[in-house]
Amino acid sequence: MGADDGAISADKVDIRLQPLNKNGAQDETDEEAADQIQLRVYKQRWIVLLAVALLNNTNTMSWIGYAPSGNYVNSFYGESSAAWLSMVYMMCTIPVGMFAMWAGREWGLRTAVLIAGWANGIGAVIRVISSLDFVPQDLRFPICMTGQGIAAIAYPFIMFLPTKVAGSWFPDTQRAIATSIGVMSNPLGVLMANLISPAIVKSPEHVIWLNIFTCVPSLIAMLIATFGVNRSEPKIPPTFSASKPQMDFVSGMKSCFSSKQYIILLIVMGGGIGMFNCLYTVMLELLCPSGYSNFFSGVCAALMIVGGVFGAAASSIFVDRTKLYEETLKIALGAAVIFGLIFLQLTLHQGYSVILGVTCLLFGVLGLATYPIGLELASECTFPVSEATSTGLIVLSGQIQSVIYVFIMKNFARPLQPDRMHIQVCQLTPDDTINTPKDNTMSIMIFSLLATLLVLTLVVLFKPVYKRLEAERGNRATADKAKELSNQNKDRITLQAESAVEPLQKK
């Protein structure tokens, strides 16, 4: 066989391996399709979520920690100090919240985590200083309020982080459970505060130990946030929606407030958050007039949270698999309001400890189950608005409504009837004029009416469109089709060119 034969043989091999390529644009399209479907999840997502969860947990402990031991805190810092140390969180969130949402969108997740971590840690240290022996009595409360105010500044930066982390770092099959872990660290902080605060604080002098208890984990969270979160987003996104550019802050705000379904969710979910915050704040004041102790108040709050952890985890796994966000939210919130109303009515009577505990548990299972679902729905209704904006507005609405509900509970309460004074356990001593027991009947009636109106609004008017899921399904279908076409083209042989080659002849 001569040189020409060898050339023909080589050409034949080349032809058989040559894929079909009608024009130069085909290769470019295939490359774009490959880039389009490039998704990846990183193990670092769990470190980022841990940092956010710890910040949420420790910041909430700082917020709620004084309420379960309010009578001792009032004696140590001054009259009504426990309520003000809780209220400062709600008041700081409102003015700082808008800036925090803008900063989270413009500066990124890592900057928000750093601001939250350092504000939380510095505030905790100042609270410890306020309770040291050398601090004069008249300076204790101002110093403590300063530290609490600095820690409160961290909360608006924390409030949108769970959904932001879930949307930026986690695949769509883990988004709801990631959001649940992030947001449920908040009520877990409430649980720890309500269990440990009454156990630590047995007299006014023990308040310093409560401050130390909240300070140590706050400093740990600050260190993890500083060294564990080194970037705002992964290099390669985990989902199609995470790869899509999000609206700027102003456009996102306009989009949110032009959506009827989002506005309904904003009011209802904000109301739910506000009512939970209010109950945490005034739990002792609700129960002590009917003879229920500080410890029992802490147990009730703990049962709510324990139930809520299981409820939120179960609901998150369920909606991750089924995507039945709307149905789950409506059923859970409706049932939660029923058990919540029963609980409130029972607080007006003595001797119902077991039933109060059961209703607290069921209220927590169903009520807190709605929290992560509602925040995920906010992202669904407003996509491609940044999660920092859509969920931040809901939590901000919750803080505003918290102030309203606490105001209602305190200002519509009346002096306790004389024939019930022998039942109450609010006063530390018979001549205690700081911890005055109240009759909460009117407050509870107004509170119950508002809760009923909120759930009816949700059930009747809320009919969302899952914009984020629809976008991901469309992108996934397009990418799968492009990938399939690309694979077919690569496997196809140019038969026409092959047939033009003469078979080799033996000499």
UniProtKB/Swiss-Prot annotation:
CDD domains: MFS_MFSD7
Location of region: Disordered: 477-507
Keyword Transmembrane helix: yes
Keywords, comma-separated and alphabetical: Membrane, Transmembrane, Transmembrane helix
Key word Nucleus present: no
A Pfam family the protein falls into: MFS_1
GO molecular function, one term: transmembrane transporter activity
SUPFAM superfamilies: MFS general substrate transporter
Compositionally biased tracts (Basic and acidic residues): 477-493
Transmembrane segments: 46-66, 83-103, 112-132, 141-161, 181-201, 207-227, 263-283, 299-319, 328-348, 354-374, 389-409, 442-462
Membrane topology reported for the UniProt record: Multi-pass membrane protein
Subcellular localization(s) per the UniProt record: Membrane
GO cellular component, one term: membrane
UniProt protein name: Uncharacterized protein B0416.5
Organism: Caenorhabditis elegans
